[in-house]
Each structure stands twice: as C-alpha cells, then as structure tokens.
Regions:
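Short, solvent-exposed loop/turn segments at secondary-structure junctions
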Residues: 14, 40-41, 79-84
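Short connector loops at helix/strand junctions that flank enzyme active sites
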Residues: 17, 25, 38, 43, ...
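Unchanged
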Residues: 48-71, 81-135
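Conserved Nudix-box catalytic region and its N-terminal flanking loop in Nudix hydrolases
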Residues: 26-64
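Nudix hydrolase/Nudix homology domain
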Residues: 36-41, 106, 113-163
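Acidic, metal-coordinating catalytic segment for phosphate/diphosphate chemistry
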Residues: 1-21
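Residues embedded in well-ordered beta-strands
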Residues: 21-23, 29-30, 94-98
C-alpha cells in the first residue's frame, strides 16, 4: 500500500522507488501478477516503508495483497531499474528475494486488490517464461534456475507502454 511512509519520492521530473519483490516457485512454476490493463507480468511485492527492513516489506506486501504469510529466504538480486510507466519516469532500486508461500494449496489463478488496484495472480511454468512478457525482463528461466549467490543487475531505460 502506498502511504505517507512509503519510499517513493518525486524527484527532478521522475519518481524514485525503493521496491521489494518475491520469487515464489512451486512445481516448476513461478508466481507472477499483473493489473488487468498491463500487457506484462511482474513479481509480486511492493514499496518499502521508511525504517522498514526489506524482508519485512515483502512479508507485509504479501499479507496485504494475498492474505498469505510468506517465508522470505535468500536475497537473489539487487536491481537498478529505469523505466516509464503510466506517463511517469521511474528510477527504482529493488531487492528480490526467494520466498515460500506455505499456505497455497493449489496453483489456481487468484485475484487481489491492493490500494484500489485489481491484481491477477497466475502460476507460470518456468520453462515457458519466454512466451510471455515479464518485467523486469532479466527474469528468465536461466536466471531463476541458475541462482547461486546474490547478483547486482543494472537495467537500461525501458518504456513499458511499448513492450
């Protein structure tokens, strides 16, 4: 949820975000979500609140979005990301953690609402990620399967309205 404590700052004509996302894998599928109007999928998560640890952010966001108590494990990626979305330019720093969702008993699609935004959650086969639009686009089957230690990733500017 975007509140007064959220680290999302308008600066110099753009918006700086500090974001955390989770990589949940189950039965060779990865959990992704999107809004009904987006043409791309992304990892679930949200913005960090001031004085909040990033692991706690992911726990809070998963509870807010899904009602599920996630277990946050390894930090996989630290990502510097520049993109345009919804008529704004973003500079985003993101922490991406592996997470376990023990309360999910099925891999059925489900919906949630976060800050008046509808979200569709879907378990996508990891081997078929290349068939859908995933953003950030470094998220591939190889990146997920070949995780050995935390990596720093820098992404070039991308306009999400034209992907």
């Amino acid at each position: 949820m975007n509140g007064p404590k959220t680290i999302s700052l308008p600066l110099d004509g753009g918006l700086f975000n500090f974001r955390v996302a989770g990589v949940a894998i189950w039965n060779d599928k990865i959990l992704l979500h999107k809004t009904p109007s987006d043409n791309f999928w992304s990892l679930p998560g949200g913005r960090v609140d001031m004085f909040e640890f990033t692991r706690d952010t992911l726990l809070r966001e998963m509870m807010e979005e899904t009602g599920i108590a996630a277990k946050v494990t390894d930090l996989m990626w630290v990502v510097e990301n520049f993109f345009a979305y919804d008529r704004r330019q973003y500079h985003e720093v993101g922490f991406y953690y592996r997470m376990i969702l023990p309360e999910l008993e099925s891999q059925e699609d489900f919906s949630a609402v976060e800050a008046d935004t509808d979200l569709l959650f879907h378990w996508h086969p990891i081997d078929k990620l290349h068939e859908i639009m995933v953003y950030p686009d470094f998220i591939t089957a190889d990146m997920i399967r070949n995780f050995e230690s935390t990596r720093h990733i820098s992404l070039s500017f991308k306009d999400l309205h034209i992907i």
